[in-house]
Amino acid sequence: MNLILASGSPRRKELLSLYTTDFTICVSDFDESGVTAPTPAQLVEKLARGKCLAVAKDHPGAVVLGCDTVVDVGGEVFGKPHSVEDAKRMLHALSGATHEVHTGVCVSDGVRTESFVDSCKVTFFPISEGEIDAYTATKEPYDKAGAYAIQGRAALWLDQLEGDYYTIMGLPVSRTALLLSRF
């Protein structure tokens, strides 16, 4: 299989390597800015599909894997923060609260396209102002949906998790492996 990961995420590269190391990376140039959907879960599936198909059209015969992840706080979508203030706003909203993380996964071989969304509920302990200030002073929150890396320092805030841990990291490994095995 000529497998292409349509993502520049180092976490997705690492997680896909659990399934196979035989893949290449081609970052999608899909424009996400005008994409809308009725729910965050539907949005993330549309984004994953858009990224996947944007790469698939230029690579006939390849199997392309596209993904996207969003944090859902009561219906409000948190993507990657645009600034320190944006990251702090997100972390304040997540502090002491439950939110959902949705990861959309799409696979296409140019003839057939299949996708799914995996969702996970996450509850954080209250996060102090000092912790938020210290965390946002690092590079960690700025390339992650919801301004946190669960596999990083944000693990200290994790109270409860319901679902697949890898969904939070951006690639639900077992469901993705099952989907890829059908191509």
Predicted features by range, described:
Residues 10, 30, 173:
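Short, glycine/serine-rich, charged loops/turns that create anion-binding
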Residues 1-21:
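N-terminal beta1-alpha1 ligand-phosphate binding loop
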Residues 2-4, 37-183:
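Anionic-ligand binding patches
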Residues 23-24, 69:
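Short, solvent-exposed secondary-structure junction/capping segments
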Residues 24-33:
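A short beta-strand-loop structural module common to alpha/beta enzyme folds
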Residues 7-9, 28, 95:
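Short linear Ser/Thr-Pro motifs
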Residues 14-18, 35-36, 57-58:
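Short loop/helix-cap segments at secondary-structure boundaries that form the rim of catalytic
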